[in-house]
Structures are given as structure tokens and as C-alpha cells.
Swiss-Prot record:
Phosphoserine: residues bearing it: 184, 249
Annotated gene: KLF10
Record-linked Pfam families: zf-C2H2
PTM (free text): Ubiquitinated; mediated by SIAH1 and leading to its subsequent proteasomal degradation.
Keywords tagged on the record: Biological rhythms, DNA-binding, Metal-binding, Nucleus, Phosphoprotein, Repeat, Repressor, Transcription, Transcription regulation, Ubl conjugation, Zinc, Zinc-finger
Record-given protein name: Krueppel-like factor 10
Subcellular location: Nucleus
Length: 480
């Protein structure tokens, strides 16, 4: 138990007089400073803890940094003042956070931004014209916004049963909370607008709007939605369009990617319009090859090329534009009489004659034997064939039949052998289908053709053909 004497009260009154002599400008400048040094914080704690009892009106303007819970629990033994019991409940630190001021609700009302909020105490958050200090950590434009690392919670517990704060008991606190929320919302909206002005990507960025900055945000959104960014892309490079993690406006934005210009001899190619269509996907990188139109046939309107990707791509969107190939246009082929010829068939007289490769012919198959009789000129492979042919011109018949009483003579030996079969009746050529036999091979060949056409011919024709095959009976050989 501690008892404070007259000396302690006198010391407190002296400090209170020193504090009252300070000008109000220094107090307001103290409140508006974002970062306080340790020495000034200790001085403020000591001065406010001793001077808040006697001058309550001054306390309302400038609330102490440390609440009354830092004092001793035996304050009721001191000679009290009439203003002690009239102190409102929001000056005390309750043993729990008030129900009408939840940190999660305040954080949800704020616009999403990559910032970290640090709350020093509950009493600082209730100041009407002072916003909590912000520590902005600028990240890369691809990273997603992070949630606040700290939340406003009560860490100083007091044994006194303080009345719960509400709109009736603490009107100043309710008004300060509303002002704090409005200031935080304005500050975050302003940060979003500044980030959108600095880093406007290929896709348009439309930050959240607020009533106080409607004109500024509308101008940024209007410029970003109407802009088409033109990139001059060489054939060996790649255009990388990075997207901002801020919310994208509902209407789809277009990116204009122009292929490299062609030389003076060719026709300049038409630009390619690339349009991103929102599509939920897990892959953050979308790679697309844009085929360029042939320069020989430039279209009247640029054909739009549609790509499918995520709504807000977290990675890079690559547009690979190939270098257009200049095709040398050939003049149409015109015939000598002036008519245009079709390119399918070669023009007569203009196509170069290809060298014909003659296959090598066997020397044994060359008709080197030519008949020397005037007006004939026939050629043969063998000399024996040429000799038999010359006998037709001379009339020589060296082969004679040896059958008794037969004096026939032949120019060729095969003709003599065939004639001899007529005397003997020999039929050495037999049909494999009907076992019929023939003296000559050509007769057997003719008979085989009838078997192939037997199904097509009627019976009476077959019979007639058989009658034609009947040969005359050979004359019997005279007996000697």
C-alpha cells in the first residue's frame, strides 16, 4: 500500500503548471508528428499521467498516451477532486476490447492495399483528427496485396470495472472511430491512385473509387481504358506485358502489337490486335504465337486475335511476332499470242527441256541384222532369222519332206517338222482342262481361249467351235 503525501501532490502541481504554460501549437505539432523519439514519448507519459486530473478540458483536447491504468490502484486514498468521478469511461483501458470497435471490421472496411498498419494503443485510435501511422512497403507489381500484420487489441488490463463504451456514454469515441475509418479509407484510396499513375501496365488498371477523389480516379480510369499501347517489336525480341494486381475494369482491354516494318520493296504489314479474354486457369504465364498476315495480300481490316488467359495474370504475357517473309511475286506467264496461261501446266516453248536419260540396252537385243533386199529393210536379232527371211526373196527351200511319196519342200526347219506330224499323226500339245491334244502350239492357244469364254457363249456356239477344231484325218502313209 502506497500513501502519497503533500510533497508528491506539490510536485504534481508544479509539473501541471509547467505543462499548462506550453503553447497549443507545440501540442498539435506533437499530435501530427508521424514518428516520435523515445525522449519525447517518455516526457509525454510523465507529464500526461500527472496533469490529466486537474485540467479535464485540456485532457479532452489532448488525451494522454498512457491511460489511467498505469497509476496505482490505491488512488482513492488521495484527497480526491470533484472532477475525478466525472471522467468518462473511454479514458480507462477496459479488460477487453469494446464490442463496437472490432479490428477485423475496420480492416474489412478499408480498401485492399499492400500496407501494414501498426496500432500503438487503443487511446491513439480514438483521436478525432489523427490517423494511425502507416508504414508502406512497396512490393513488386506482380505480388498480391498482403493483409495487415497487426490488429488493434487491448494489452493493458485494469482491475476497475469500467463501463462499456457505446454511443451514449462515449460520443467523442464514436465520432473519432468514424473519422479514423474515413481517413484510413481516403489514405488507402489515394495510395491506389498514385500506384496506378506510376505503374500503368498493358492491361488497364481501374482502382477503387471514393467520394472525395471521384474526379481523380475517373480521369485515371478514363485514360487507361481508352489507351492502346503501341510497341515496335523486332523479330528477335519478345514483348512482355506485365499486369498490375489491382482490380481490372469490367470491360476488356486491347493491346496493339505492331510487327516490324518491311523494307521499301515489300508492302508494310498490318498490325495485330491482341485481346485478352478472362478465363480461370492455374498457369500464371500465357505464351501465344501471333501469326502475321502475308504482305502480298493485306486485308482491309485488321483481323483480331483472341487469347485465353487468367482474368488478372500474375505472371508475364508474351506476344511472339514472327518476321514476315516477303514473297517475290512472279509475273503471269503470257503465251506468244498474248493469252494468259494457267500456272498449273507449264507454258509451251518456255519450259526448259530436261535431259532424257536413256536406259542401257543389252547389246544382244539390238536388231543389227538388216535385210539387204531392195525395198525391204527388215531387221532381226539373229542371223538365222535374217537368213530364213532372205529365202523368201530368193525362193530357196532347202528343207524337203522325207516321207515316201511326199515331195514338199520348206524354207525353214520348223515348218518341215510341223509337216511331218501330219504324216505320223502325232499331237504333242495337250489341253490341261479337257485333255484334248493338238499338233500345233498355236492351235492349243486358241483352244485355251475358248475355255475362258465358255460361260459367256451359248451351247450351240460351243458345238460349232468344236466342229471347227476337228481336223481332217491324216492321210495314211503308203506302205513300202
Amino acid at each position: 500500500m502506497l500513501n502519497f503525501g503533500a510533497s508528491l501532490q506539490q510536485t504534481a502541481e508544479e509539473r501541471m503548471e509547467m505543462i499548462s504554460e506550453r503553447p497549443k501549437e507545440s501540442m498539435y505539432s506533437w499530435n501530427k508528428t508521424a514518428e516520435k523519439s523515445d525522449f519525447e514519448a517518455v516526457e509525454a507519459l510523465m507529464s500526461m499521467s500527472c496533469s490529466w486530473k486537474s485540467d479535464f478540458k485540456k485532457y479532452v483536447e489532448n488525451r494522454p498516451v498512457t491511460p489511467v491504468s498505469d497509476l496505482s490502484e490505491e488512488e482513492n486514498l488521495l484527497p480526491g477532486t470533484p472532477d475525478f468521478h466525472t471522467i468518462p469511461a473511454f479514458c480507462l483501458t477496459p479488460p477487453y476490447s469494446p464490442s463496437d470497435f472490432e479490428p477485423s471490421q475496420v480492416s474489412n472496411l478499408m480498401a485492399p492495399a499492400p500496407s501494414t498498419v501498426h496500432f500503438k494503443s487503443l487511446s491513439d485510435t480514438a483521436k478525432p483528427h489523427i490517423a494511425a501511422p502507416f508504414k508502406e512497403e512497396e512490393k513488386s507489381p506482380v505480388s498480391a496485396p498482403k493483409l495487415p500484420k497487426a490488429q488493434a487489441t487491448s494489452v493493458i488490463r485494469h482491475t476497475a470495472d469500467a463501463q462499456l463504451c457505446n454511443h451514449q456514454t462515449c460520443p467523442m469515441k464514436a465520432a473519432s472511430i468514424l473519422n479514423y475509418q474515413n481517413n484510413s479509407f481516403r489514405r488507402r484510396t489515394h495510395l491506389n491512385v498514385e500506384a496506378a499513375r506510376k505503374n500503368i501496365p498493358c492491361a488497364a488498371v481501374s482502382p477503387n473509387r471514393s467520394k472525395c477523389e471521384r474526379n481523380t480516379v475517373a480521369d485515371v480510369d478514363e485514360k487507361a481504358s481508352a489507351a492502346l499501347y503501341d510497341f515496335s517489336v523486332p523479330s528477335s525480341e519478345t514483348v512482355i506485358c506485365r499486369s498490375q494486381p489491382a482490380p481490372v475494369s469490367p470491360q476488356q482491354k486491347s493491346v496493339l502489337v505492331s510487327p516490324p516494318a518491311v523494307s521499301a520493296g515489300g508492302v508494310p504489314p498490318m498490325p495485330v490486335i491482341c485481346q485478352m479474354v478472362p478465363l480461370p486457369a492455374n498457369n500464371p504465364v500465357v505464351t501465344t504465337v501471333v501469326p502475321s498476315t502475308p504482305p502480298s495480300q493485306p486485308p482491309a481490316v485488321c483481323p483480331p486475335v483472341v487469347f485465353m488467359g487468367t482474368q488478372v495474370p500474375k505472371g508475364a504475357v508474351m506476344f511472339v511476332v514472327p518476321q514476315p517473309v516477303v514473297q517475290s511475286s512472279k509475273p503471269p506467264v503470257v503465251s506468244p499470242n498474248g493469252t494468259r496461261l494457267s500456272p498449273i501446266a507449264p507454258a509451251p516453248g518456255f519450259s526448259p527441256s530436261a535431259a532424257k536419260v536413256t536406259p542401257q540396252i543389252d547389246s544382244s537385243r539390238i536388231r543389227s541384222h538388216i535385210c539387204s533386199h531392195p525395198g525391204c529393210g527388215k531387221t532381226y536379232f539373229k542371223s538365222s532369222h535374217l537368213k530364213a527371211h532372205t529365202r523368201t526373196h530368193t525362193g530357196e527351200k532347202p528343207f524337203s519332206c522325207s516321207w515316201k511319196g511326199c515331195e514338199r519342200r520348206f524354207a525353214r526347219s520348223d515348218e518341215l517338222s510341223r509337216h511331218r506330224r501330219t504324216h505320223t499323226g502325232e499331237k504333242k500339245f495337250a489341253c490341261p482342262m479337257c485333255d484334248r491334244r493338238f499338233m500345233r502350239s498355236d492351235h492349243l492357244t486358241k483352244h485355251a481361249r475358248r475355255h475362258l469364254s465358255a460361260k459367256k457363249l451359248p451351247n450351240w456356239q460351243m458345238e460349232v467351235s468344236k466342229l471347227n477344231d476337228i481336223a481332217l484325218p491324216p492321210t495314211p502313209a503308203p506302205t513300202q
